[in-house]
Amino acid sequence: MLKFTAEHEWLKFEGDIATVGITSHAAEQLGDLVFVELPEVGATFAKDGDAATVESVKAASDVYCPLDGEVVEINQAIVDDPSLVNSDPQGAGWFFKLKLSNAADAETLLDEAAYKELIA
């Protein structure tokens, strides 16, 4: 199941674990990324908490935690090579995996059609 947020993040769910990243739209708006800072494994966040930071040649932006949960894995590859986020934002450019406090909260997120309408 793939869901989206109004803050341009995507979540792919596998049970109570969500892989989180920024959308292709967000990556295009930011331009070429030069720096990514990710949360530490074990960090817990409330929905909309500042979970990560990205910097591009144009701007710096926070990446928010889309749901309450605990970070169980990070993608070190994008720290080492931020351009992965630009080249494959909804694949190899994922940010972190989140163990959800309440998996039912996923129902509050946007589906793909609603997200496409938001960015149209």
Swiss-Prot record:
Pfam families attached to this UniProt entry: GCV_H
Region forming the signal peptide: none
GO CC terms of this entry: cytoplasm; glycine cleavage complex
Cofactor note: Binds 1 lipoyl cofactor covalently.
Cofactor(s) needed for function: (R)-lipoate
PROSITE patterns: BIOTINYL_LIPOYL, LIPOYL
Keywords: Lipoyl
Domain Lipoyl-binding: residue ranges: 17-99
Record-linked CDD domains: GCS_H
Biological process terms in GO annotation: glycine decarboxylation via glycine cleavage system
Highest taxon listed in the record's lineage: Bacteria
N6-lipoyllysine: modified positions: 58
UniProt cross-references to InterPro entries, sorted A to Z: 2-oxoA_DH_lipoyl-BS, Biotin_lipoyl, GCV_H, GCV_H/Fam206, GCV_H_sub, Single_hybrid_motif
Homology family: Belongs to the GcvH family.
HAMAP family cross-referenced by the UniProt entry: GcvH
Function recorded in the entry: The glycine cleavage system catalyzes the degradation of glycine. The H protein shuttles the methylamine group of glycine from the P protein to the T protein.
Subunit structure: The glycine cleavage system is composed of four proteins: P, T, L and H.
Annotated protein name in UniProt: Glycine cleavage system H protein
UniProt organism field: Agrobacterium fabrum (strain C58 / ATCC 33970) (Agrobacterium tumefaciens (strain C58))
